[in-house]
């Protein structure tokens, strides 16, 4: 469904796969309009990767039109991204009056590198199910992706000392920084060995920001930054003038000086709120290919961390 899933398939499958994405890189996945060409692509597919929640509500219609029994829900070629992932923002009730409420939880999983790693594992499992004779290729692709992601997130030195899997478990458990501060290596706290994105995120760690839409929950969770308020008071519904006025007042009085938004939102509208609230705007893509030079998941996360850190350093 999404370009970011297509990129993960390429990472894992390499030359053994041909992959295309339905949504374009700078398109809001909620609002993709099914086209006949999409159904034709699915009709000839061996596998179909989707979030598996209620982000791509247009998927059932496409699968029905395609009529490919190998990739319908429950078939061996149907691969869900969310499997094994702890979901955030699970609503108490499924009342749509609150806007675009996702009844199963927040589906914007790929803003967290470690949850994205789990998606890569799920894709690998699915590809091996479809093409077991190429399992070794897929396992090797996943191993390479995993090593690079660990090194980019934690820093190669810390991965060498502690091990990527252990660091992943500590981070998921919310105890990574406590562990690194409490333990030493050669007389120095292990926290000094932290590198990668987590080290470079230090300028915004523990900080509050303004977000346009609730698509950064998993980024918040991994990098310890908090969306204190949203331009969209109700997800997926354009903000009212009254809400925008209240938000701008809050931004000024509470010194909420940085706003984070995806590039598929109208830049003029986002810039207006940021300017009136006297905030630095960080508007970044959510998918590889949405901006020149962002060609894979690693350069995508690099962009998020670099631009958000720069916004705080410039305050």
Model-derived features with residue positions:
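Extracytoplasmic metal-acquisition and chelation regions
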Residues: 1-315
